[in-house]
Amino acid sequence: MSVLEVVLYPDEGLAKVCEPVAQVDDELNQFIDDMFDTMYEHEGIGLAAPQVGVLKRVITIDIEGDKTNQVVLINPEILESCGETGIEEGCLSIPGHRALVPRKEKVKVKALNRKGEEVIYEADGLFAICIQHEIDHLNGVLFVDHISALKRQRIKEKMQKLKKQIERAK
C-alpha cells in the first residue's frame, strides 16, 4: 500500500471524463487500497481516481474517516435523486478552498463493489453529497465548476501559484 500523488487543479486531467472499469481484479483492488491510503493521509472523506491521475470510474469514500465504513464505488450511476441541499465543499485537488455547492439531498446509486458485485446505496446527508461530488470528478466536473466564473478564476490563479511553489520545492 502506498500514498499516491494528488493531482491539483487546474490540471487538465481533472476535466476529463473517465472510462468505465472493464474488470475488477487484484490490480484494481491494490489501487483501491492505495486510494484509501491517500485519502486518509490527506484527511479526506472521498477520493476519485482522476484525483490521483487515473482516468477510471473508481471512488473511495469513508465519511467517518475511521476505516470501519469504507465504501468503494466502481462505475457508479445515480439512479434517482430528490430534494435540495448544499454545504461548503472542499476538495483534495483544491486544498485550502471551499465553496457552497447545490446538491440533491438524497441519491440512489448503483455501482460495483471491490469484489465486482453490484451494490445499491440509498444515501442522504453528507454521504449523498460526497457521492455526488466524487461522481462529478468522474465526469470531469469539479466543485469550482458550480460557482461563479470570477470566484473560479481567483481560485485557479491561487492554485497555479501553489503548484509553482510545490514544483520549486521539489
Curated annotation (Swiss-Prot):
EC number: 3.5.1.88
InterPro entries hit by this protein: Peptide_deformylase, Peptide_deformylase_sf
Keyword NAD: no
Chain ranges passing through the membrane: none
Sorted UniProt keywords: Hydrolase, Iron, Metal-binding, Protein biosynthesis
Cofactors, names only: Fe(2+)
One GO-annotated biological process of the protein: co-translational protein modification
Catalytic activity: N-terminal N-formyl-L-methionyl-[peptide] + H2O = N-terminal L-methionyl-[peptide] + formate
Residues that hold Fe cation according to the record: 91, 133, 137
GO molecular function, one term: peptide deformylase activity
Catalytic machinery residues: 134
Cofactor note: Binds 1 Fe(2+) ion.
Family to which the UniProt record says this protein belongs: Belongs to the polypeptide deformylase family.
NCBIfam families linked: pept_deformyl (TIGR00079), PRK00150.1-3 (NF001159)
Alphabetized PANTHER family for the sequence: PEPTIDE DEFORMYLASE (PTHR10458:SF21)
Function: Removes the formyl group from the N-terminal Met of newly synthesized proteins. Requires at least a dipeptide for an efficient rate of reaction. N-terminal L-methionine is a prerequisite for activity but the enzyme has broad specificity at other positions.
Protein name (Swiss-Prot/TrEMBL): Peptide deformylase
